[in-house]
A protein has these predicted regions:
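GIY-YIG nuclease catalytic motif and its immediate N-terminal context
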Residues: 1-53, 57-89
Length: 89
């Protein structure tokens, strides 16, 4: 699987942005409390955005760019997502 950037909506309404090369495994880690400290105790978690990248460096650059966006801009990005993920492609 190629690298990508994802956004999760936490149970408290906040958004978390991260990168992975295995989205199903990473989502399971977050949901089991083995993901980022930020998402622990903030469930339930919902995937609201996924974007494929060519490699880890590209994914990291895109993650940084997304983290610079305002919440409104992140919400617009999430709203534009068509729902395709590595598990359904």
């Amino acid at each position: 699987m190629k690298w990508g950037v994802y956004i999760l909506r936490c149970g408290d309404g906040t958004l978390y942005t991260g990168i992975t090369d295995n989205l199903p495994r990473r989502l399971e880690a977050h949901r089991a409390g083995r993901g980022a400290k930020y998402t622990r105790g903030r469930g339930p978690l919902a995937l609201v955005y996924w974007e494929k990248q060519t490699d880890r460096a590209a994914a990291s650059r895109r993650e940084w760019a997304i983290k610079q966006l305002t919440r409104t801009e992140k919400e617009a990005l999430a709203a534009s997502w068509d729902g395709d993920t590595p598990a359904t492609e």
